[in-house]
Amino acid sequence: MTHLLDPTAGTGPTRDGLDAWRDLPAAQQPSWPDQQALREVVQTLAEVPPLVQPHECDLLRERLARVARGESFLLMGGDCAETFDANTTEGIRGKVRTLLQMAVVLTYGASVPVVKVGRMAGQYAKPRSADLEAATGLPSYRGDAVNELDGDRTPDPKRLVRAYANSAATLNFMRAMATDGSADLSSVHEWNTEFVRSSPLGHRYEELATSIERALAFMRACGLDIAEMPATHGVELYASHEALLLEYERALTRYDRTGGAAYALSGHLVWVGERTRDLGGAHIDLVSRVANPIGVKLGPGTTPETALALAEKLDPDRVPGRLTVISRMGAGRVREVLPEIVRHVERERGPGSVIWCCDPMHGNTHETANGYKTRHFDDVMDEVRGFFEVHASLGTHPGGVHVELTGDEVTECLGGAQQLTAEDLVGRYETACDPRLNNGQSLELAFLVAEMLQAARVNR
């Protein structure tokens, strides 16, 4: 379908209640000191071209519908908080390359397609637990879209325009990598083979890597030119971020003139975080009114009743692929809390009415004795195992994983095959907010999840 956009959606009379959120509690919004500057920026953003197109969002929803039916697996990954300074060619290439490497391993393990969604091209805002930092008395850093990590941290609405521009540049580069041969299956597999050769625990993953190599060799022996096959030469790659800054999201919302639906065209998929998912709040109201695929994060304090109410609010028509529920329980709580949530939602809404996805990062954060916020790889993997165990016990589909990662060999998360310790963190601790898995740890996670997917397939 050809979609025609209404360019006046951000400035003209509102339809379908797109501004109803303005009368609701809006958590985690910056205290913009210059309201006139904010109004001017919002006007500018309402007039610029959208970052993505409705038909792309619709296609992602179709792909996610297969995930909901158990026919695909969802991989979401990228920075905790993107920064303007790190938005470089090599930085973007590294994250995309890592996602592609993980996806190849997961595809083979699951024997189903992997839907690849970057936590990229818009993740420039972060919720914080307090407006001021206790240690410095400065305003909290709320992401590059709001204020600078260095300096006096005064929220500056002009940074929203920079966030838009950086997101556009990232999307442009992601689209190029998806089709220029960078995603060629043989090349990605060779990167993974190098990881297996160099990893201290590479012998554990050698069998899976060898099996993939044999499959590729079989295809070549059959006369199939992998480099010329669209399915193995290019990929579909989508962008997602937390819909946190409401003025930004509203300004980039457009109406599809063809069908009349509103789309949040700041990204293909947007989600509402644990701190802003109040059922009667502004964030849930706004995303409930757009046609994109959307997500909602659920922490360990979520009740089954709340989870169901959120699902009914965000996806009342039960559109396949519409809603992804991203659990972030923590390794110590996932086996206790998640089963009743899944059981209640599936019973009341029917099987496959939502996608169940695991964020094993946010519930496993702690501070080391030397003052670094970190996560241990063992805790991350334990939450993923718990997630799979819950779904195996209920007969439901473990639909995906949502991981904070980078393509660089940073030292931010403990453990893994590299056996990083607290003393190692000082080496390359580069995150602007929360700790990320490095390239090696990300691939290790992918190999381990692939083993879980294989086991789930055998036991199905």
PLM regions and their residue ranges:
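Long, contiguous, compositionally biased segments that the model treats as domain-scale units
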Residues: M1-A145
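Polar low-complexity intrinsically disordered regions
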Residues: M1, R347-P351, R460
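A generic secondary-structure signal
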Residues: R63, M102-V105, D285-L286, E312-K313, ...
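Non-transmembrane, aqueous-exposed alpha-helical and coiled segments at domain scale
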Residues: P316, R322-I326, A331-W356, H362-T411
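Anionic group-transfer/hydrolysis microenvironments
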Residues: G78, G118-M120, G299, D359-M361, ...
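Active-site-facing alpha/beta catalytic cores
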Residues: A81-E82, A86-G330, R375, G400-V401, ...
